[in-house]
């Protein structure tokens, strides 16, 4: 148990699988100080992937269902496999269960890479399984509880730009 918990998810189970697999098949816990990213992974080569983040307040992931729906939408928009929401929900809970820091509001992040680059020899030998990282961190920058001031601004392009220029991926982070 720790104040920083890092798990590598089973991409085959968490993306494209059906139902919830046994806990041992969902995530593998690793030392957060150890290097774990494969140099041939598209997240390292091109930043190719999707992510979500939320606060876990006193053991409860805030709006997790909405964050996982948005993760699914992001996956669809970039032609990645569909996430297995029940399995991801369980995997998140397994990570939370390993957390034991007194900080009540650590940051939870789910990072999903497209997997190994198929244009490399290593990637050609592997299947196109997403790489999934889930971590909880009480030692990083946490959400402020202070009130904020917001302003509404234009993004500098028309609201219908997505229909005319879908390659912009406008709305991937709704």
Feature locations, PLM:
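Ordered, amphipathic secondary-structure segments that act as subunit-interaction surfaces
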Residues: 92, 97, 101-112
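Helix-start/capping segments and mature chain N-termini
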Residues: 1-86, 90-94, 113, 121-174
């Amino acid at each position: 148990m720790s104040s920083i918990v890092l798990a590598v998810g089973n991409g085959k189970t968490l993306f494209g699988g059906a139902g919830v697999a046994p806990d041992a098949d969902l995530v593998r816990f690793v030392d957060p100080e150890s290097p774990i990213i494969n140099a041939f992974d598209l997240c390292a080569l091109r930043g190719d992937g999707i992510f979500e983040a939320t606060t876990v307040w006193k053991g409860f992931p805030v709006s997790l269902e909405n964050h996982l729906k948005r993760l699914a939408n992001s996956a669809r928009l970039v032609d990645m496999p569909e996430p297995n929401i029940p399995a991801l929900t369980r995997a998140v809970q397994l990570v939370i269960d390993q957390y034991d820091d007194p900080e009540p509001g650590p940051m939870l992040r789910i990072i999903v890479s497209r997997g190994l680059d198929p244009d490399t020899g290593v990637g050609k030998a592997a299947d196109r399984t997403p790489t999934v990282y889930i971590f909880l961190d009480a030692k990083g920058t946490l959400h402020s509880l202070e009130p904020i001031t917001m302003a509404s601004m234009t993004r500098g392009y028309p609201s219908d730009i997505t229909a005319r220029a879908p390659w912009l991926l406008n709305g991937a982070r709704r």
